[in-house]
Amino acid sequence: MSLGFWNCATTRTSDFVVSVKTEPDGTSWFSLNSDGSRGDLIKINGGGYRMPSSPETLREKVVDEYGNIRSEEQGYMQGADVFNFVIREIPRDIKRLAEWSGEDLQGLDYYVFHQANNFINTYLAKKLRLDAERIPSTIAKFGN
């Protein structure tokens, strides 16, 4: 069985795409990318090494022009920018990994995407011309 696993993430210091393609004999192909320019798209300011947990980091306050209330220890994501990153970068990276590994994407038995949301996974399937039946999904049952 041939599997393709894809995930992407943004950290405080870098964006990265992780793609893995595994052969039946255990051979794996990885694509790891990082540039750091969008490191603030998903963030949690407090509770870590740079800003240790304290009463101040736990205190909730209005933090943006929309009146959202959160503490420094609650996560924040710039959803539209993350979405644009995913739909621009992930298909390109998946195609590049398939080329490097010598695999036709249509030849994989299953495609395993990060279960962030169904819209993105459906978009990726269409963009890459993949059979949706070979993309397992747990989003409806478990969410992200």
Language-model segment annotations:
Residues 100-103:
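Glycine-rich helix-loop-beta junction characteristic of Rossmann-like nucleotide cofactor-binding loops
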